[in-house]
Amino acid sequence: MKKNVQYKGNLLILGTAFLWSFVGIITKAVSYNALTVTGISSIMAVLVLVIYNRKHAWHMTPLAVWTGVVIAVMHICFMVANKHTTVTNTIVLQYSSPIFVVLYYRIFQKKKLKKQQLLAVGACFIAMVLFFAGELTMRNMFGNALAVLSGICFAGEFYLCAKPENDAVLAHVLSHIICIAVCLSYTGLFVRQEYDWRQTGLVLLSGILCIGLAGVTYTIGCRMTTALNANLIAMSEVIMAPAWAFLLFRERAGSWPAAVLMVGAIVYEIWFEAKEERQG
């Protein structure tokens, strides 16, 4: 891979992480219900994806549908978690996903875990315990639990989209359609919501840029750089989102030792997998 191409790919992934880092910030900043935010932003995100992939040959399969459901659950859990716990806790716990990918391969494909993988998995679960032990309210614990579930589904997205017979583009489009149907139906039936144009505009912008455009830049960037670079650079979101949360809300992580342990374990796991792939 040419260095200038890889450099551009790295910049695209960094830009993606920058856009992603504002999703939780905007969700927490507006007064709207989290499901309302998810539904409205998904409208714009699906429009961006459909326009960008207008020449895509769509292949509707049960696998694509199930993948869409998993991604939709991931989006919903992530958005709701941001309303119930800190932005830092939410993003760090969601990025536990590589550990769950390892477990999926062990459970569904019977791949034996190497000692390095067991070490990373163990460290992540210890970090999760520390996150929950540091929370004194049921509200924050509920948010942390949703963030973990978001990470489990995020891992499911990677695992299912990697299957060659799957139509990952269709799965992502379906996920946003599901979010629109479920979230806006719930909002219409059960949520008394007062809207104003500033907050609605912010949520719409989030859907266009932070979800829709970010999905496009991530797809292009991954084609132009290595898997290791893409994973590690995308993880800069774990630094950016807490920084914005502190600057805007003076919000701190529930447990910095847990956050450092979690991020360290995930970086180690990504590095180990890349090393194994290079060695064949």
What residue ranges belong to the model's regions?
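Juxtamembrane C-cap of transmembrane helices in multi-pass membrane transport proteins
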Residues: 19-32, 76-85, 93, 156-167, ...
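C-terminal transmembrane-helix exit sites in multi-pass transporters
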Residues: 50-54, 97-119, 239-257
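Hydrophobic alpha-helical transmembrane segments of multi-pass integral membrane proteins
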Residues: 8-12, 34-51, 117-123, 142, ...
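Specific transmembrane alpha-helical segments of multi-pass solute transporters/efflux pumps
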Residues: 53-90, 94, 126-130, 207-225
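C-terminal-most transmembrane helix of multi-pass membrane proteins
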Residues: 2-3, 42, 235-280
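Helix-helix packing/entry segments at the starts of transmembrane helices
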Residues: 90-96, 161-178, 211-247
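Glycine-/small-residue-enriched transmembrane alpha-helix faces in small-molecule transporters
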Residues: 1-36, 69, 77, 126, ...
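Hydrophobic transmembrane alpha-helices of multi-pass small-molecule transport proteins
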Residues: 42, 46-49, 69-71, 103-104, ...
